[in-house]
Curated annotation (Swiss-Prot):
Residues 744-760 have a biased composition (Polar residues). GO terms for cellular component: plasma membrane. This is Disintegrin and metalloproteinase domain-containing protein 5. Residues 396-485 form the Disintegrin domain. Detected in testis. Residues 633-667 form the EGF-like domain. Residues 17-706 are extracellular. GO terms for molecular function: metalloendopeptidase activity. It comes from Cavia porcellus.
Length: 777
């Protein structure tokens, strides 16, 4: 027994590595256990029972993906030649989660080849590593401590502190309404490990890679508040020698590293490059360019790993530097507070163990930076993981179901109840001879198009839906038109979504009736954290931020029980309210109440909260998730600008004008209203009658202004063409006259030359004759 104790003590010192302050706690054999989530999704959810200081703790974990199939590690062999390997084997190893029963806890594990990671409570952290020399899945647990607590945060120049003071002065004058809501953003990171750190972490490619991935896992866990997620693009390890001179002055080394990055690494503009180094007694913890995360030239940093610190502390250093580049400054005010004992952006955070959260000042800094400068360089989607699409089975065409489907000219119902027997053949769904239409609310029994302006679809929601009218050119009613998603309704307390004003109260009234209302948040949190058929967000229980988007929970003020056909009801007494949640029983008999009945959002029924329902200030529900309202609509129509504040935007991105204003731009016009899409005829002038609106969005047929358009465009064109023709005719005459004169002069010259030639030919002959006569004499 004594020998075993000595062995474990020695192993504890060995696995503690270069930090002599790591306190060995115990060895343990983690036991993988089964739960609701792990039974349904073995690949994405795991749970372990871990004994720590004599107590048993259940650790619940969910897979985290910050590697892609294209992530690569680069290193150098003994000859200095660069080699590369995919990081694919490490892709499915990273998990994060919490300790059950401890809301202020955090767990980050790598599960390949044993468990390796950190368990964080409020004021203490424990590291766990596998003991490879012992069999039976034995692990060692030790308490994280830091030996070196005197590392300067800023360095000698203290530049970040000065920047913070200047920024704080400027930001105090900015009203909080300029702060935007946070949305998920992804930082693609190119990580370089220099030779010093490579040697300090073990001088082994695989070991160093695992530790870097573990550090980034901790970084992502800390960035949850800011909705930032670091994705590892590549890891380059300078395993032979440093490519950049290490001067031990991070501020100077940063410029050298940035210059090396520009010359040797081809990165996209939204990639951030970081050099991770080691220094026993550094001047500071690192360097970066504050507020330049989106600047291609300056999106880089240097993080220094001081001797005697833990991997947890190194993760805090990286978080602080990345935060600086994203506009988050260090906390220097007593008014900054957070939910943990130590806030992330403080010097104490680097050396303290346990949980750390961003302070109120940090959150304001980040939101201000995002609203003022934007984070468009950062992707808003994670890596596209390959999945197989689940195509729904193709629906078979059915003639006689009163629905006109592909391949049918009309469908008036069955032979017995056909609504347009004169117009449509109910057996073949073909229009009869001479019929203009065969079915539809705008088709008369005489097979003619209904007159324009006849109501064909009445609004079902006074705030969010619009009436539609026959346009006089089709037997069908025009496409459904309704308010743009995100338009306020219910006196500003809810959002319009797909033509309905979505509120918890209305949904409860429709589901169970009586004086039921939407339950308070405490009820939703209590019920939807169950993870069963009565409370869930589909495949699993709802996390607290999404609790209002799972199963519908209502208050029930009546003494009698809820009695509804095909509904099973559960009651919960939360504080002063009786809350009820329901599940449908008509589809199948519930045999296992620990399992949810719906796996896909498309399969939800009325017992779930509807999409578009408010789940927080400026937030709405979408497929079990509570999202920022900025994502609720992607249209370009702005009611204040495009509709001049006299209408609202519809789902087709056009203005629906209030009464007394005419579309499309809602100009004042007595008696007018609506949009270009609702089918009714829009009056344009007192004398010219009406302008007919085509069913196709944005296409307008101008029946009265067409001739005016032709007149105003055609007349100038005709004048220009006529002028050209006249000009060409005059030029032609001039050309012909010039040609005639030229020919005349040519002919005169020719005749003159002929006469002259004849005269000249006569004189030599006479001269010769006279000479002969003189010779004879």
């Amino acid at each position: 027994m004594f020998l075993v104790l000595v062995l474990l003590t020695g192993l504890g010192r060995l696995y503690a590595g270069n930090n002599p302050r790591k306190t060995f706690v115990q060895t343990t054999v983690p036991e993988r256990i089964s739960s609701v989530d792990t039974r349904r999704h073995l690949e994405h959810n795991v749970a372990y029972n871990i004994t720590l200081k004599g107590k048993s703790y259940v650790v619940r974990l969910k897979k985290e993906s910050f590697l892609s199939s294209g992530s690569v590690i680069y290193f150098y062999d003994n000859r200095g030649v660069q080699r590369s390997q995919p990081l694919l084997p490490e892709m499915d190893c990273s998990y994060s989660g919490y300790v059950a029963g401890f809301p202020h806890s955090r767990v980050v594990f790598a599960t390949c080849l044993g468990l390796r990671g950190v368990i964080q409570f409020e004021n203490v952290s424990y590291a766990i590593e596998p003991l490879e020399v012992l069999s039976g899945f034995t692990h060692m647990i030790y308490e994280e401590n830091n030996d070196n607590t005197h590392v300067p945060l800023f360095g000698k120049n203290n530049s970040y502190a000065r920047i913070h003071n200047l920024e704080s002065q400027g930001r105090r004058s900015v009203h909080k309404t300029t702060v935007s809501k946070l949305s998920p953003r992804y930082i693609d990171m190119y990580i370089v490990v220099n030779k010093n750190l490579f040697d300090y972490l073990g001088s082994d490619i695989k070991t160093v890679t695992q530790k870097i991935i573990q550090v980034i896992g901790l970084v992502n866990a800390m960035f949850t508040q800011l909705k930032l997620h670091v994705l590892i693009s590549s890891i380059e390890i300078w395993s032979r020698s440093n490519k950049v001179t290490n001067t031990r002055r991070p501020d100077d080394d940063l410029f050298r590293f940035s210059d090396w990055k520009r010359k040797h690494v081809s990165l996209k503009s939204h990639y951030v490059a970081y050099l991770l180094t080691f220094d026993k007694y550094p001047e500071s913890i690192g360097a970066t360019f504050p507020e330049n995360i989106c600047n291609e030239e300056y999106a880089s940093g240097i993080a220094v790993y001081p001797a005697g610190l833990s991997l947890e502390s190194f993760a805090v250093i990286i978080v602080q530097l990345l935060s600086l580049s994203a506009g988050v400054m260090y906390d220097t005010s007593d008014s900054c507070y957070c939910s943990t004992d130590v806030c992330t952006m403080t010097q104490e955070a680097v050396f303290a163990s346990g949980l750390k959260d961003f302070s109120t000042c940090s959150m304001d800094n980040f939101k201000y930076f995002a609203s003022q400068y934007g984070l468009t360089c950062l992707r808003n989607t994670s890596y596209d993981m390959p999945i197989y699409k689940q195509f729904p089975p193709r629906r078979r065409r059915i003639c006689g179901n009163s629905i006109r489907e592909e391949g049918e000219e009309c469908d008036c119902g069955t032979l017995r109840n056909c609504t347009h027997k004169k117009c449509c053949d109910p057996m073949q769904c073909r229009m009869k001879k001479g019929a203009k239409c065969g079915t539809g609310p705008c088709c008369t029994v005489d097979c003619q198009f209904q007159k324009a302006n006849v109501l064909c679809r009445k609004s079902v929601d006074k705030d969010c839906d619009f009436d539609e009218y026959c346009n006089g050119r089709s037997g069908d009613c025009v496409h459904d038109t309704y308010a743009q998603n995100g338009h306020f309704c219910d006196s500003g307390g809810a959002f319009c979504f797909n033509g309905r004003c979505r509120t918890h109260d209305r949904q409860c009234q429709a589901l169970i009736g009586g004086d039921s209302r939407g339950a308070p948040f405490a009820c939703y949190d209590e019920v939807n954290s169950r993870g069963d058929v009565y409370g869930n967000c589909g495949r699993h229980q709802c996390y607290i931020q999404h609790a209002l988007c799972g199963k519908l929970v209502c208050t029930w003020p009546h003494k009698q029980l809820v009695s509804r056909v095909n509904l099973s009801v559960v009651y919960a007494h939360v504080r002063d309210d009786i809350c009820v949640a329901t599940t449908k029983t008509v589809r199948k008999i519930i045999r296992d109440l620990s399992l949810t009945t719906v796996l896909l959002p498309e399969d939800r029924d009325e017992t779930f909260v509807e999409d578009g329902t408010i789940c927080g200030p400026g937030q709405y529900c979408d497929k079990w998730f509570c999202k920022e309202v900025q994502f609720i609509n992607n249209g370009s129509c702005n009611a204040e600008i495009h509709c001049q504040g006299r209408g609202i935007c519809n789902n087709l991105d056009n203005c629906h004008c209030h009464k007394g204003f005419v579309p499309p731009e809602c100009a004042p016009k007595k008696g007018q209203f609506g949009s270009l899409d609702d089918g009714h005829l829009v009056e344009t002038t007192k004398t010219s009658g009406f302008r007919k609106i085509n069913m196709r969005r944005g296409y307008v047929v101008l029946s009265t202004k067409r001739f005016q358009l032709i007149f105003y465009i055609g007349i100038p064109v005709i004048i220009i063409v006529a002028a050209i023709l006249i000009k060409q005719n005059q030029l032609g005459k001039l050309f012909c006259r010039g040609e005639k004169e030229h020919m005349s002069s040519v002919s005169e010259d020719g005749s003159r030359s002929v006469t002259l030639s004849a005269t000249e030919s006569k004189f030599p002959a006479d001269t010769e004759h006279s000479n002969k006569e003189e010779d004879a004499q």
